């Protein structure tokens, strides 16, 4: 990830602090879908975190008093499940100078000197992008016969699981299959899945998560041999059309380095939402 790329500040766009809070709640909901599954711990307390799926801290609401001890306690608890964690600091996290405290705890190694910060300390935490859905243009060109279907039953989701896992090169997709199967595919589902086909062959897949006052596309996946045909962009476009039809005027995505250019072609722009990342790992890891 090129952290020096220019990002448009959220203040320069029609984005309010509440909008960013909705983004955070949507992000939390994504990880909450996996709560309770084997090998996954999701803690929803003053600090909300996930281990086994993401290894990430999603929200922090701590008091100023004894803050260093609370940071150490959090790392100690998470360290029982993983050797590394991304502590994401959103604008709504407290205290307001949490990032500075995390940096200082990193200098002394966290609890018992067992942890260290690495990477870009206090960096943007990935490729956060924003799109004005009212300006969404035409989908990219795709092979003849390409079309998208929404997953409406278990059989279709089983097919989604195979093509999505293939695109990510994943050997074990049991957590995704279990989480989304448990969530269901009815009209009230927050997670809406899509499969792209050429003829009858599944070639790409994605998920739209509508939750927390926000809508975002996740899990965009195309097998390596089928890439560079506009498939990932086209299925993302189909999901965005559903978000727009549900009344959302804008959206965001947390893009991989590989996917960033795909989303830029749809109109997404790199944006600084005020989110900062502190990457921790155990010194023995």
Please provide the spans of the model-predicted regions.
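Acyl-donor-binding surface of acyltransferase catalytic domains
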Residues: 65-155, 276-280
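Conserved beta-hairpin
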Residues: 40-43, 91-105, 190-204
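Conserved acetyl-CoA-binding loop-helix of GNAT-fold acetyltransferases
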Residues: 67-75, 219-224, 228-241, 245
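A conserved beta-strand-loop-helix scaffold within acyl/acetyltransferase catalytic domains
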Residues: 171-225
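Conserved active-site tyrosine of GNAT-family acetyltransferases
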Residues: 102, 263, 268
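Conserved GNAT acetyl-CoA-binding A-motif
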Residues: 81-91, 243-255
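N-terminal charged segments
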Residues: 1-82, 94
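A conserved beta-turn-beta hairpin within the catalytic core of GNAT-like acetyltransferases
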Residues: 48-58, 210-217, 227
């Amino acid at each position: 990830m090129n952290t020096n790329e220019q990002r448009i500040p959220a203040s320069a766009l029609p984005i309010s602090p509440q909008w960013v809070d909705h983004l955070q709640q949507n992000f939390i909901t994504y990880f909450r879908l996996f709560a309770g599954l084997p090998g996954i711990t999701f803690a929803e307390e003053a600090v909300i975190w996930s281990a086994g799926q993401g290894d990430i801290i999603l929200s922090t609401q701590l008091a100023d008093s004894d803050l260093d001890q609370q940071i150490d306690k959090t790392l100690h608890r998470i360290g029982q499940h993983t050797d590394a964690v991304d502590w994401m600091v959103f604008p709504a996290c407290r205290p307001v100078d949490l990032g500075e405290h995390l940096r200082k705890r990193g200098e002394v190694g966290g609890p018992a000197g067992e942890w260290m910060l690495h990477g870009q300390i206090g960096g943007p935490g990935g490729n956060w992008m924003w799109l004005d859905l009212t300006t969404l243009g035409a989908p990219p060109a795709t092979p003849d016969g390409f079309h998208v279907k929404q997953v409406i039953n278990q059989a279709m989701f089983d097919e989604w699981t195979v093509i999505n896992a293939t695109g990510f090169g994943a050997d074990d997709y049991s957590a995704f299959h279990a989480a989304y199967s448990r969530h269901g595919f009815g009209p009230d589902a927050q997670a809406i899945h899509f499969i792209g086909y050429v003829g009858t062959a599944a070639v790409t897949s994605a998920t739209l998560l509508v939750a927390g006052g926000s809508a975002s596309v996740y899990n965009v996946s195309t097998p390596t041999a089928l890439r560079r045909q506009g498939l990932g962009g086209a299925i993302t476009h189909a999901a965005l059309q559903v978000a727009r039809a549900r009344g959302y005027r804008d959206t965001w995505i947390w893009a991989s380095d590989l996917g960033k250019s795909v989303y830029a072609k749809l109109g997404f722009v790199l944006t600084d939402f005020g989110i900062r990342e502190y990457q921790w790992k155990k010194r023995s890891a």
